[in-house]
């Protein structure tokens, strides 16, 4: 009986977290829209810049990450070696897709946490190795 009561008591999210989430979800939305617009703009800058240099990248619908398939001429390297190439020659750090499972080895993941200037700077560095 005690095990059953304990399972009910410890099931679910910590209550203060639930209360904070409720307040956030029911509160003003202007900051959420501002953050969404910021990430959408960064996504557009990155994807458009990469597409212009010949790296075909589909913009994601809603995320702060961009998954990009490794261009064909670099694909044989695998994601880890391609990431090393980007870091050493383009001075751009991305996450290798292999770190997310075998199916990810043909991809790299860009984060959109940097500002527009840094994203454009990264695209220029990548352009140099293309």
List each model region and its residues.
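PLP-dependent class I/II
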Residues: 1-130
